[in-house]
Amino acid sequence: LTKAADMTASALLRGARGNSGVILSLLFRGFSKSLKGKLEANGKDFAEALSAGVEAAYKAVMKPAEGTILTVSRLTGDAARDLAADDANLESVLMGSIETAKVALENTVNQNPVLKKAGVVDAGGMGFVTILEGMLASLQGNDVALQENAGETKEQADFTDFATEDITFAYDTVYIVRKKDETVNLEPLRVYLDSI
Protein backbone atom coordinates (compact mmCIF):
# COMPACT_ATOMS: atom_id res chain seq x y z
CA LEU A 1 0.00 0.00 0.00
CA THR A 2 2.78 2.40 0.91
CA LYS A 3 4.60 1.74 -2.36
CA ALA A 4 1.42 2.16 -4.43
CA ALA A 5 0.56 5.44 -2.68
CA ASP A 6 4.12 6.75 -3.16
CA MET A 7 4.14 5.78 -6.84
CA THR A 8 0.77 7.44 -7.41
CA ALA A 9 1.88 10.67 -5.73
CA SER A 10 5.12 10.68 -7.73
CA ALA A 11 3.35 9.99 -11.05
CA LEU A 12 0.81 12.73 -10.37
CA LEU A 13 3.59 15.22 -9.69
CA ARG A 14 5.54 14.28 -12.82
CA GLY A 15 2.40 14.46 -14.96
CA ALA A 16 0.95 17.59 -13.37
CA ARG A 17 -0.33 20.24 -15.76
CA GLY A 18 -1.44 23.61 -14.41
CA ASN A 19 -2.61 24.54 -10.94
CA SER A 20 -5.12 21.72 -10.60
CA GLY A 21 -2.56 19.11 -11.59
CA VAL A 22 -0.06 20.37 -9.05
CA ILE A 23 -2.75 20.59 -6.35
CA LEU A 24 -3.85 17.03 -7.16
CA SER A 25 -0.27 15.83 -6.81
CA LEU A 26 0.02 17.62 -3.45
CA LEU A 27 -3.22 16.04 -2.25
CA PHE A 28 -1.84 12.61 -2.98
CA ARG A 29 1.56 13.46 -1.53
CA GLY A 30 -0.15 14.17 1.81
CA PHE A 31 -2.33 11.10 1.29
CA SER A 32 0.78 8.98 0.68
CA LYS A 33 2.61 10.31 3.75
CA SER A 34 -0.36 9.41 5.93
CA LEU A 35 -0.35 5.81 4.67
CA LYS A 36 3.42 5.37 5.07
CA GLY A 37 4.27 1.99 6.61
CA LYS A 38 0.77 0.55 6.20
CA LEU A 39 0.19 -2.72 4.38
CA GLU A 40 -3.55 -2.15 4.10
CA ALA A 41 -6.08 0.53 4.99
CA ASN A 42 -9.60 0.67 6.34
CA GLY A 43 -12.11 3.49 6.00
CA LYS A 44 -10.65 5.40 8.94
CA ASP A 45 -7.15 5.21 7.43
CA PHE A 46 -8.53 6.44 4.10
CA ALA A 47 -10.31 9.35 5.79
CA GLU A 48 -7.18 10.33 7.73
CA ALA A 49 -5.04 10.10 4.59
CA LEU A 50 -7.49 12.19 2.58
CA SER A 51 -7.60 14.81 5.34
CA ALA A 52 -3.79 14.89 5.43
CA GLY A 53 -3.77 15.41 1.68
CA VAL A 54 -6.27 18.24 1.88
CA GLU A 55 -4.22 19.92 4.61
CA ALA A 56 -1.03 19.62 2.53
CA ALA A 57 -2.74 21.06 -0.54
CA TYR A 58 -4.25 24.02 1.32
CA LYS A 59 -0.89 24.81 2.94
CA ALA A 60 0.84 24.83 -0.44
CA VAL A 61 -1.56 27.21 -2.16
CA MET A 62 -0.90 30.88 -1.47
CA LYS A 63 -4.45 32.04 -2.19
CA PRO A 64 -6.90 29.14 -1.95
CA ALA A 65 -10.05 29.75 -3.97
CA GLU A 66 -13.46 28.22 -3.37
CA GLY A 67 -15.13 26.35 -6.18
CA THR A 68 -11.97 24.48 -7.11
CA ILE A 69 -10.40 21.08 -6.50
CA LEU A 70 -9.55 22.37 -3.02
CA THR A 71 -13.22 22.75 -2.12
CA VAL A 72 -14.17 19.39 -3.62
CA SER A 73 -11.38 17.59 -1.76
CA ARG A 74 -12.02 19.40 1.54
CA LEU A 75 -15.72 18.54 1.57
CA THR A 76 -14.90 14.98 0.53
CA GLY A 77 -12.37 14.66 3.35
CA ASP A 78 -14.90 15.99 5.88
CA ALA A 79 -17.47 13.47 4.66
CA ALA A 80 -14.94 10.62 4.78
CA ARG A 81 -14.13 11.42 8.42
CA ASP A 82 -17.82 11.49 9.34
CA LEU A 83 -18.50 8.25 7.48
CA ALA A 84 -15.48 6.49 9.01
CA ALA A 85 -16.64 7.45 12.51
CA ASP A 86 -19.79 5.38 11.92
CA ASP A 87 -18.34 2.57 9.80
CA ALA A 88 -14.66 1.77 9.21
CA ASN A 89 -15.39 -0.31 6.09
CA LEU A 90 -13.24 1.14 3.31
CA GLU A 91 -15.72 0.43 0.52
CA SER A 92 -18.58 2.13 2.39
CA VAL A 93 -16.47 5.17 3.25
CA LEU A 94 -15.18 5.47 -0.31
CA MET A 95 -18.67 5.14 -1.81
CA GLY A 96 -20.08 7.82 0.49
CA SER A 97 -17.09 10.05 -0.13
CA ILE A 98 -17.60 9.81 -3.88
CA GLU A 99 -21.24 10.85 -3.53
CA THR A 100 -20.18 13.92 -1.54
CA ALA A 101 -17.42 14.67 -4.05
CA LYS A 102 -19.91 14.59 -6.94
CA VAL A 103 -22.27 17.02 -5.19
CA ALA A 104 -19.34 19.32 -4.32
CA LEU A 105 -18.13 19.16 -7.93
CA GLU A 106 -21.53 20.11 -9.34
CA ASN A 107 -21.62 23.08 -6.95
CA THR A 108 -18.25 24.48 -8.11
CA VAL A 109 -20.01 26.25 -10.97
CA ASN A 110 -21.94 28.27 -8.36
CA GLN A 111 -18.90 29.08 -6.21
CA ASN A 112 -16.38 30.27 -8.76
CA PRO A 113 -17.34 33.27 -10.94
CA VAL A 114 -15.10 32.19 -13.83
CA LEU A 115 -16.68 28.73 -13.90
CA LYS A 116 -20.15 30.25 -13.62
CA LYS A 117 -19.48 32.56 -16.55
CA ALA A 118 -18.24 29.64 -18.67
CA GLY A 119 -20.99 27.30 -17.42
CA VAL A 120 -18.61 24.49 -16.46
CA VAL A 121 -17.49 22.63 -13.33
CA ASP A 122 -13.92 22.69 -12.05
CA ALA A 123 -11.71 20.40 -14.15
CA GLY A 124 -9.36 19.62 -11.26
CA GLY A 125 -12.31 18.67 -9.08
CA MET A 126 -13.56 16.42 -11.85
CA GLY A 127 -10.14 14.76 -12.05
CA PHE A 128 -10.22 14.20 -8.29
CA VAL A 129 -13.67 12.56 -8.51
CA THR A 130 -12.48 10.38 -11.39
CA ILE A 131 -9.49 9.16 -9.36
CA LEU A 132 -11.76 8.30 -6.41
CA GLU A 133 -14.06 6.38 -8.75
CA GLY A 134 -11.03 4.50 -10.09
CA MET A 135 -10.00 3.63 -6.53
CA LEU A 136 -13.46 2.24 -5.82
CA ALA A 137 -13.55 0.24 -9.06
CA SER A 138 -10.16 -1.26 -8.24
CA LEU A 139 -11.19 -2.04 -4.67
CA GLN A 140 -14.28 -3.84 -5.98
CA GLY A 141 -12.13 -5.84 -8.41
CA ASN A 142 -13.55 -4.10 -11.46
CA ASP A 143 -11.59 -2.85 -14.42
CA VAL A 144 -11.26 0.90 -14.54
CA ALA A 145 -13.10 1.81 -17.71
CA LEU A 146 -11.64 4.53 -19.89
CA GLN A 147 -14.45 6.70 -21.13
CA GLU A 148 -14.51 8.49 -24.43
CA ASN A 149 -17.25 10.77 -23.13
CA ALA A 150 -17.48 11.17 -19.37
CA GLY A 151 -20.89 12.80 -19.43
CA GLU A 152 -22.86 15.71 -20.71
CA THR A 153 -20.81 18.40 -22.37
CA LYS A 154 -21.64 21.81 -23.67
CA GLU A 155 -21.34 22.05 -27.42
CA GLN A 156 -19.47 25.28 -26.99
CA ALA A 157 -18.75 27.25 -23.86
CA ASP A 158 -19.25 30.99 -24.27
CA PHE A 159 -15.87 32.64 -23.78
CA THR A 160 -16.73 35.91 -25.55
CA ASP A 161 -17.02 37.80 -22.26
CA PHE A 162 -13.50 36.78 -21.31
CA ALA A 163 -11.97 38.51 -24.34
CA THR A 164 -12.81 41.97 -22.94
CA GLU A 165 -11.27 41.42 -19.51
CA ASP A 166 -7.90 42.87 -18.62
CA ILE A 167 -5.33 40.17 -18.09
CA THR A 168 -2.90 41.13 -15.35
CA PHE A 169 -0.60 38.16 -15.82
CA ALA A 170 -0.18 36.45 -19.18
CA TYR A 171 1.40 33.32 -17.72
CA ASP A 172 0.96 31.21 -14.64
CA THR A 173 4.18 29.70 -13.37
CA VAL A 174 4.07 26.93 -10.80
CA TYR A 175 6.99 25.95 -8.61
CA ILE A 176 7.18 23.22 -6.03
CA VAL A 177 9.53 23.97 -3.17
CA ARG A 178 10.70 20.95 -1.23
CA LYS A 179 11.98 21.62 2.25
CA LYS A 180 14.84 19.52 3.56
CA ASP A 181 13.83 20.54 7.06
CA GLU A 182 10.12 20.48 7.95
CA THR A 183 10.65 23.28 10.50
CA VAL A 184 11.62 25.81 7.81
CA ASN A 185 8.99 28.54 7.53
CA LEU A 186 8.00 29.26 3.93
CA GLU A 187 5.90 32.31 4.80
CA PRO A 188 8.67 34.89 4.14
CA LEU A 189 9.14 33.39 0.66
CA ARG A 190 5.38 33.53 0.03
CA VAL A 191 5.22 37.17 1.12
CA TYR A 192 8.13 38.06 -1.14
CA LEU A 193 6.70 36.21 -4.15
CA ASP A 194 3.32 37.83 -3.62
CA SER A 195 4.97 41.27 -3.68
CA ILE A 196 6.61 40.91 -7.09
Stretches with model-predicted labels:
Residues L1-I196:
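N-terminal loops that bind phosphate or other acidic moieties
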